């Protein structure tokens, strides 16, 4: 009698193991099912702040349209159109600068500084550097040409192509506290002190 009970128990255990192996081999789920993975869309604050320019290309040559007219250069001196997207949350104004770190001055060369651009702006049209098409309420600082407004590339003849950094700043203040005759360096100091994010495109020019 005892032997029969043991035999039946062993037979039952073997059958159970065989059934489990068959179920696993057939690809059936034997554990607790996992919930489906959710696709998370990044918030605006997680997206990257970007700048683009229809007439400029990254590491590409700047057209004569945007080159300085003077000092031996014969361009049209029209500031390029700029566009930006995904500014960070809390942006209260924007600023735009154009700077050549390769100029043989020891401190580079400021070609353009525009600030107090309203927070609802998404870019600047071509020619905004003259002030005519600039956003209402914006201001421009003195460049290293000794005047306000855009001054295009004009590197020394024979230099390797210079790098021109067109940069947009997203700022945490709606207006910069600088005097009307502030230099580009002074404005740049205040931009870096109040920036939330920056984006830039670098283009080249040589002659």
Model-identified regions with their sequence ranges:
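Generic secretory/membrane-interface signal
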Residues: 2-3, 17-18, 75, 105
